[in-house]
Regions:
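Terminal leader/tail segments of proteins
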Residues: 2-166
């Protein structure tokens, strides 16, 4: 197979189907966060973005709007098992792996939480690929043509979720 044929095969594979799901928010998981009887925010589960798991450091950005209002990154954290960090700090945690069956929560600090009823969540997750394919020998092909490294995958979802009790 020539170099050009390998490039064409990789471009064809990358251009078809994506590894990341657009079913990001786990249905039925939206709930208020309550501490000592006070609503301090809300949280929801994120579905795993890949059938094989995800390195947290590959999450380049998580954007969230709730009922049309953008949520500030400073108010948003990600929790995976006993690991908790601000969403802006995921790239610094290269040793944290989100296995396929692990629960992952997005936690938002908001005094009063959310009212009972339906809420529209719009989430966008930008994920850098954690591995790639070379169409050349050794490192040939990675520098200028490693499409999967240079073009992160973006998953988007708009979903209506319900909180039964405020």
């Amino acid at each position: 197979m020539t170099k050009e044929e390998r490039i064409a095969a990789i471009d064809a594979a990358i251009g078809h189907g994506q590894m990341m799901t657009d079913d990001i928010v786990h249905k039925g998981s939206l709930q208020n966060k309550v501490i000592c009887g006070c609503r301090t925010g809300y949280k929801f589960k994120m579905n795993n973005l890949s059938y094989r798991g995800v390195w947290i450091s590959t999450l380049e950005n998580i954007s969230l709007k709730v009922d049309g209002e953008e949520v500030s990154h400073k108010d948003m954290s990600i929790q995976l098992r006993d690991f908790l960090c601000n969403v802006d700090e995921t790239g610094n945690n290269t040793d944290v792996f989100w296995a396929a069956k692990d629960e992952c929560w997005i936690i938002v600090n908001k005094v009063g939480g959310l009212s009972a009823g339906d809420h529209t969540l719009e989430i966008e997750v930008t994920k850098r690929n954690d591995f790639g394919h070379s169409f050349g020998e050794a490192e040939e092909g990675y520098a200028e043509n490693a499409h999967e490294f240079q073009h992160p995958t973006v998953g988007k979802q708009k979903i209506v979720c319900r909180i039964e009790e405020a």
